[in-house]
A protein has these predicted regions:
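Bacterial N-terminal signal peptides that target proteins for export
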Residues: 2-20
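Hydrophobic alpha-helical elements and their junctions with loops/disorder across both membrane
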Residues: 28-31, 244
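Short linear Ser/Thr-Pro motifs
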Residues: 11, 30-31, 214
Length: 298
């Protein structure tokens, strides 16, 4: 604990590898998610689970409907992948969503871009994970890191936001240790410098964007050249001591992956509807539909 305080006093945040190592030690000694006076104070449970060697899965949300968001937040996902790059969601809408249901799933935002405005708005409304799309230059991810972190580590300004109401009065002192940075590798240019991207201390996760890699290269999964590209990204990430991410369809089918993007809410609604129409529950057992509106026979 004292070691972390000394390091933090010098740099503003200890190297993520040291943070996670100390988190793992603390969690081994205290089997609760929120240990008394942890060093550093961790409330991002995704960091805690990864430090324990567990895999994490996030559901994808692209709609501003609060009922849908809160259902996803309490469905059992480790985090929610709030999709702002490929949706019409506004920061005001996402702020309302996160405030309505800040957990149990931790809010991660895929920002439209890695600009100062996008990054600072995302963290100010309470995101504990920043997913940066199309990382194909060091400048892009370094810029995102800079504006996601308070000084002395970064240049995040201290302004208005709802983060304090969500994560506690000591947020300013603990934010740098709780906000995760996910770099998405979506094209050959990003794959070419993935070793440099993964080596950046404040990059926590490198995401292998399976569909976009296929789109940009013209290759399909299973093609030897595609698989070589995916393996290159994975190996460089693991060599740097970081976590490898991919689609949830790869969970259990590819080694070395710890962080997964799950299906969007629309796909899950469709899956649930099909199960209901077949008279089955998600455990595959037959179920009848109760005559009372709004309930199910279980």
């Amino acid at each position: 604990m004292q070691t972390m305080n000394l390091v933090g006093a010098v740099s503003g945040r200890a190297p993520r590898s040291l943070t996670l190592a100390l988190a793992a030690v603390a969690l081994a000694a205290v089997p609760t998610a929120h240990a008394a006076e942890p060093a550093p104070a961790l409330y991002n449970t995704v960091i805690e689970k990864l430090a324990r060697g567990e895999q994490v899965v996030g559901g994808t949300v692209s709609t501003a409907d609060l009922n849908v968001y809160c259902a996803m937040a309490s469905a059992g996902f480790d985090f929610l992948w709030i999709e702002m790059q490929h949706s019409s969601l506004t920061y005001q809408e996402v702020a309302t969503m996160i405030r309505a249901c800040p957990g149990p799933a931790i809010p991660f935002i895929r920002v439209p871009d890695g600009t100062e405005g996008d990054i600072q708005k995302a963290v100010d409304i309470g995101a504990l994970g920043i997913i940066v799309p199309m990382v194909d230059t060091l400048e892009k991810i370094q810029n995102a890191i800079t504006f996601a972190n308070y000084p002395p580590l970064g240049k995040r300004s201290q302004g208005g936001g709802q983060y304090g109401a969500l994560w506690g009065r000591n947020y300013r002192q603990t934010a740098n240790d709780n906000i995760m940075m996910v770099a998405m590798i979506e094209n050959p240019a990003g794959a070419e410098i993935v070793d440099q991207i993964a080596a950046l201390d404040d990059v926590d996760v490198v995401f292998v964007a399976s569909s976009d890699l296929s789109s940009f290269t013209g290759l399909r999964q299973g093609d030897p050249s595609y698989e070589a590209l995916v393996t290159k990204i994975k190996d460089a990430t693991l060599k740097a001591g970081k976590y490898v991410a991919g689609p949830s369809a790869w969970k259990g089918t590819r080694d070395g992956y710890s962080f997964f993007q799950g299906p969007p809410e629309t796909a899950l609604i469709q899956s649930g509807a099909r199960l209901s129409l077949r008279g089955e529950a998600d455990d595959g057992q037959p179920r009848g539909v109760a005559p009372m509106e709004g309930s199910e026979g279980r």
